[in-house]
UniProtKB/Swiss-Prot annotation:
Organism expressing this protein natively: Rickettsia peacockii (strain Rustic)
Similarity-based family: Belongs to the HMBS family.
Record-linked Gene3D superfamilies: Periplasmic binding protein-like II (3.40.190.10), Porphobilinogen deaminase, C-terminal domain (3.30.160.40)
Pfam family, any one: Porphobil_deamC
Gene name in the database record: hemC
Recorded metabolic or biological pathway in which this protein acts: Porphyrin-containing compound metabolism; protoporphyrin-IX biosynthesis; coproporphyrinogen-III from 5-aminolevulinate: step 2/4
Residues of the signal peptide: none
Cited function: Tetrapolymerization of the monopyrrole PBG into the hydroxymethylbilane pre-uroporphyrinogen in several discrete steps.
NCBIfam families assigned: hemC, RPE1
Protein name according to UniProt: Porphobilinogen deaminase
Biological process, per Gene Ontology: protoporphyrinogen IX biosynthetic process
Membrane-spanning intervals of the chain: none
Complexes and interactors: Monomer.
């Protein structure tokens, strides 16, 4: 086992909070490992005056960090999963996630409590085409203007009257301790589905780095890991970018996800040495369709299979047409459910 880890991350206050949360998890299992934070400025951080869909999409928040991973300048990278494209460079893999926080969006406005209450032709600051599509579905009269920057800068722009309102992720507001119920109002899932992976902190490594894989297997939150599979499969199949209004949110239907633990994935190896070797080989592999590495449930010990319901949204490029779909599946077939939804909805949106 390694004695130290170089952890790559963006330099934003929220990214550093995420990184320290990952370090806390690592220290729980490996208290003697030294964790060095390596802040990296990404292209997405440098270019703030243009919408992401004009400059390369959310991958711009990962490009330099992933290159540092490939160049072995860092051992592990921390991302907001919502910024991770569906397709990851082949030598890399999302090997762990932390427990998902509340992924809902928040309507931030000094005078009004909801999108519906805004006056005619009010201005909402948002660069996300997903949010723009939902806003225009609810209130087609509203003007949605490009609104980039970190959480603090966006709130300052709101306070100075640059826009009438904005929409931000609850998780970021909470972790930065700037959620104020006086002007921050949660938006329910029924009104606005969250971004794929929103509320999830992801850990990316080189897939051949066994030391990092061992660490990731320990810190990985399996209930969240299972939930994001249909969301990520949906994203990967559509090869969606920042020009495509797309959303998905998964939740367990019949069980408390905290009950899904590593014990449920305990593997029992019996038989001759060849069988043992085969079982050991199968216990760690990459699911190519989602870019996730995980331990296969060779023996599931809980009494019933966990069921997952995922709500999907897909719009056309200009946001004038939006379609919704819901899939219910168990954890063994959740990836296939995401692909199935993508195929059906793509056909519907193209009609």
């Amino acid at each position: 086992m390694t004695n130290s880890i170089r952890i790559g991350t963006r330099k934003s206050p929220l990214a550093l909070i995420h990184t320290n949360l990952v370090i806390q998890q690592i220290k729980q299992f490996f208290p003697d490992i030294n964790c060095e934070i390596v802040p990296i400025i990404t292209s997405g951080d440098l270019i703030q005056n243009k919408p992401l869909y004009d400059i390369g999409g959310k991958a711009l928040f990962l490009k330099e960090i992933e290159q540092a991973l490939l160049d072995k300048k860092i051992d592990l990278a921390v991302h907001s999963l919502k910024d991770v494209p569906g397709r990851i460079p082949e030598p890399l893999v999302i090997a762990a996630v932390l427990e998902r926080e509340d992924p809902r969006d928040v309507f931030v406005c000094l005078k009004y409590k909801s999108i519906e209450e805004l006056p005619q032709n009010a201005v909402i600051g948002s660069s996300a085409v997903r949010r723009k599509a939902f806003i225009q579905k609810i209130r087609p009269d509203l003007k949605v203007t490009v609104f980039r920057g970190n959480v603090d800068s966006r709130i300052k722009k709101l306070m100075t009257g640059e826009v009438d309102a904005t929409i931000l992720a609850y998780t970021g507001l909470k972790r930065l301790e700037v959620f104020n119920p006086e002007y921050c109002h949660l938006i329910e899932y029924s009104q606005m589905l969250p971004c794929i992976g929103q509320g999830v902190i992801a850990v990316e490594i080189r897939k051949d780095d066994n030391a990092m894989l061992e660490i990731c297997n320990q810190i990985n939150h399996l209930p969240t890991f299972e939930l994001i599979k249909p969301e990520r499969a949906f994203l990967e199949y559509l090869d969606a970018n920042c020009r495509t209004p797309i959303a998905a949110y998964s939740q367990y239907l019949d069980a408390n996800p905290r009950h899904l633990s590593k014990l449920a994935y305990r593997e029992v190896f019996e038989g001759n040495t060849e069988a043992l070797a085969t079982a050991a080989y199968k216990s760690n592999r990459t699911d190519a369709s989602t870019g996730l590495t995980y331990k296969l449930p060779l023996e599931v010990e809980f009494g019933k299979m966990y069921n997952i319901q995922t709500n999907f949204m897909l719009g056309n490029l200009d946001g004038s047409k939006i379609t919704f779909h819901t899939e219910t599946t168990n954890i063994k077939t959740s990836t296939e459910a995401g692909i199935k939804a993508a195929k059906m909805m793509l056909e519907a949106i193209c009609k």
